[in-house]
Amino acid sequence: MPLNEAKGELLTIHAPELDIDFLLKSTLFVSPLGDNNYKVGATFNWTDKTSDPSEEGKEELVEKLKKVINVPYTIIDHTAGIRPTVAGRRPLVGVHQEYTQLIVLNGLGTRGVMIGPTVAKNLFNHLEKGEELDEEIDIKRFKRKVAK
């Protein structure tokens, strides 16, 4: 599968005055978790392959957050991880061509939090109702090259 790695960093903040119950999307996302806690992200780094949070990542998120919200907050967590991405920036979804018992839903990249539910529903309808997958996300768009 044509996956690439990209490091992403997230903050969890506590912001009682923010009081939103919807996903806010700008140069970053702010997603409510409940109890006045919010997930804020994310960064995108192609070169750093560690899963360690960095000061640079934290500073980037704080600077972007200043432009999106104007209420006081406290950072309660800072995490990092490696996200799978795909050339063309479209997810990989469907039944693996070689290992048919393997179902794939991957490569959501930076928009995973936004498109994940729709892509998952599309996969469910494909598996359970026989509906076709959207050709932009169907794993079949990457034909396996067979050596002769």
Placement of each model-derived feature along the sequence:
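Flavin (FAD/FMN) cofactor-binding core of flavoprotein oxidoreductases
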Residues: 63-148
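Active-site substrate-recognition segment that forms the wall
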Residues: 1-99
